[in-house]
Design a protein with these regions (language model features):
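C-terminal substrate-recognition regions of SAM-dependent nucleic acid methyltransferases
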Residues: 177
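Acidic/aromatic-lined carbohydrate-recognition and catalytic surfaces
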Residues: 1-166, 170, 174
Length: 177
């Protein structure tokens, strides 16, 4: 978004250009609110219900979706489903000891299971984020972190995780995304 037009309103100002190119499908890279600082290009989402402030607002996203649709262009946003930022509310509540939210993640009390997994798991970023598990003092355990230590993998065996994302997807769909 920012490299093409600066903001969501900027993208809206370029719809005529997109139409002239024959674009019928516009995929915007991560634009939901990431963690502060290093966010792996926006893939460490801290809030799925808000847009990065420098890009605009959820109302701007909804307006853009409507304007694009009126021109025959479908809009999709990159929705990160594997993990959330360590600063996301669910991780914060897991650190606070709320069992419901601890269960949103794969947390191990010692290295027994992580070491067994590590024998066969490839490392995504071996040079700067080696391993797939990160010790977190707040939860008192090893958190599965496939990409970076600040990206906590979600436990998709937990139906509450599915329900949370169903709500997120429905909210975006109701906004025209």
């Amino acid at each position: 978004t920012e490299r093409f037009a600066g903001t969501l309103r900027g993208v809206e100002d370029r719809i005529d250009y997109l139409r002239e190119l024959g674009v019928t499908y516009l995929h915007l890279m991560p634009l939901l609110t990431p963690r502060p600082g290093d966010s792996d290009g926006g893939y460490a989402v801290a809030d799925y219900r808000t847009v990065r402030p420098d890009l605009g607002t959820m109302d701007d996203l909804e307006h853009l979706a409507g304007e694009l649709r009126a021109e025959g262009i479908s809009l999709v946003v990159d929705l990160v489903l594997n993990h959330v930022a360590a600063e996301h509310e669910w991780a914060v509540r897991a650190r606070a000891g709320e069992q419901r939210y601890r269960d949103y993640f794969l947390i191990f009390p010692d290295r027994t299971e992580p070491d067994a997994y590590e024998r066969t798991l490839p490392e995504v970023f071996p040079d700067f984020a080696p391993g797939n598990f990160t010790w977190d003092d707040g939860v008192g355990g090893w958190v599965w972190t496939t990409f970076n230590s600040f990206q906590w993998d979600l436990n998709w065996r937990n139906p509450h995780v599915m329900a949370e994302f169903a709500g997120i997807v429905l909210d975006l769909a109701n906004r025209g995304v």
